[in-house]
Design a protein with these regions (language model features):
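Preference for intrinsically disordered or flexible, low-complexity segments
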Residues: 1-146
Length: 146
């Protein structure tokens, strides 16, 4: 198999995020690192088993991204929370980290839950399309016949 054929089979679109370096819009359709402000009316910041609030890690507004996986079709917003110390790699979601997903028909409200103890400084994210991204050779995602 020629190199160009391998590249064609492996290439996938992806998104590269840049944090900071521009003035945030403060609108609901902005993605953030270190800040979460969209919640269902009945939600608050999640807590771990010890009752300690998780830190806001990221909020991603999917409709404005230049690419979105078909696996996320119907999802408008993803929010991610993590504990400190940070969760272990491959740790099950729940106690030390949590992802919330919100569809287009869900009512979301802005809530300001300050997290003064968070090690993460909030930065708005700017998304850029990467037309061809490739899996790592040792990281999986490469068909056996290549």
């Amino acid at each position: 198999m020629e190199r160009k054929d391998i590249r064609k089979r492996l290439a996938r679109p992806a998104i590269k995020f840049a944090a900071g370096g521009f003035r945030p819009t403060q609108s609901d359709d902005e993605s953030w690192l270190g800040k979460v402000f969209l919640f269902r009316p009945d939600e608050t910041v999640p807590k771990n088993a010890a009752g300690i609030e998780l830190h806001p890690y990221a909020q991603l507004y999917l409709p404005d991204l230049p690419f979105c996986s078909s696996a996320l079709r119907g999802i408008r917003v993803l929010t991610v929370f993590i504990s400190e110390p940070f969760p272990e790699p491959f740790e099950a979601m729940g106690d030390n980290w949590l992802i919330r997903e919100y569809s287009f028909d869900e009512v979301l409200v802005r809530k300001d839950f300050a997290s003064p103890d968070s090690p993460l400084k909030p930065f708005a994210l700017k998304a850029e399309l990467v037309e061809e991204d490739f899996p790592l050779w040792d990281g999986g995602g490469i068909p056996r016949d290549i």
